[in-house]
Amino acid sequence: MTVGMVPGASIAGMVFSLVVSFALPIGLFVYAKKKLGAKAAPFFIGCGVFFVMVLMLEAAIHRIVFQLAGEALAGSVILYAVYGGLMAALFEETGRYIAMRFLVKPMDFPNAFMYGAGHGGVEAMLLCGVASISNIAGAVMINSGTMSAQLATLDAEKAADTAAALSALWTTPSLTFFAGGVERIIAVVLHLSLSILV
């Protein structure tokens, strides 16, 4: 399989999503600390709750559910969307409630804002930021010819499989790479709002 070139607009989208994923949480942290007078601890409590509730507990339940009913979920977009939404609501909002009830003190607007920035911010960094770094590294290797040189050292089957896996970087519409950053902005605003409401 021939390795294509990753369009400059796609790389710009990757960089945009990367910058949003890291600059937005850091900017919100600084804003909440300096302008709102929030404590720093709620930010890190938000990060910790995301890690425990989503990356550990929710992920463990997903593994069990997909072993038992993976085919049914994969076969229905609606069922999959409902399942995903319910699981996110259950784990993230339970974690948010526990944090707000027992950990974030005092429970006021500035600290609720700071918690939301931490919870949504670490999610942006880990889900979109890390993927953007990987995409940018792959795009640079492809466009510089390094990837083609690496593929030439593999046997034909492995080279074809690797090129097929990488093909999304040059076949995906460029706007899609911007979408990750836009979606993270929306998600962080949602986390801020939900944290303030709770």
Sequence positions of predicted segments:
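Hydrophobic alpha-helical segments at protein termini of multi-pass membrane proteins
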Residues: 1-198
